[in-house]
Amino acid sequence: MTALRARIAAAAALAVAYIALTMAVAAGLFNPLDKQVLQGFLGLWNESLHPLFQAIAELGGLEVTTLLMIGLVVYLLRRRFGADAWVVLAFVAAQALELFYKATLYHPGPPRSIAHTDGPSITELVSSSGPLANSFPSGHMVRAVVVYGLIAFVVQRLAPWSLARRLAIPVATFVIVLLAFDRLYLDVHWESDVLGGLLLGAVALLAGSVWLDRPLPGGDN
């Protein structure tokens, strides 16, 4: 119970941090730093690496992360953890909050004359123009933190192989960090968008882990 309370407190602290970041972004306080980081990544650009980073972007795309989340739910159901499968709501809620902030917070992404072509995704149809064209927070980062974090959490507890349990969190962390770099390298997001996605995703991940580790009636979990 102590560990669960600590996780709940951490989720609350991250939620407060996310709200504070959102207010700072709305006030334009991150604009100078966003532009400095963008300029730094423009200097790193190598056209020959473009296809590679487009492929990396797919790891955080709606299509791949949704399939992975469905796979996690199916796995939990097959293992007779039916109630645990409701952790999918953490993913759904995070997606809903991402869309809410993009629809209500005016924060255009880097100019399209600068940004490089992102990995193909159905989200491009609704994010290229209209009310969802704002870029805060990064949807790729939100999805990556929630999905890869939850998969790592489940693997660490249920995988029959000790190597898989040991590698679960490092691999998930590597994928998340790689996607954060990818968002900035392709110049499709400001650094504040990436931070926002990390924070919002972390809140949803912690909420999901609390559900998975909840005390069960008549026993300890």
Regions found by a protein language model. Give the residues of each.
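N-terminal transmembrane-helix/juxtamembrane module of multi-pass inner/ER membrane proteins
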Residues: 1-68, 104-128
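Interfacial segments of alpha-helical transmembrane regions
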Residues: 5-13, 69-97
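Aromatic-anchored segments of alpha-helical transmembrane domains
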Residues: 17-20, 92-100, 174-184
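Divalent metal-coordination and catalytic microenvironments
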Residues: 37, 56, 101, 140, ...
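Hydrophobic alpha-helical transmembrane segments
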Residues: 57-79, 143-151, 155
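Membrane-embedded catalytic cores of phosphoryl/pyrophosphoryl-handling enzymes
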Residues: 118-221
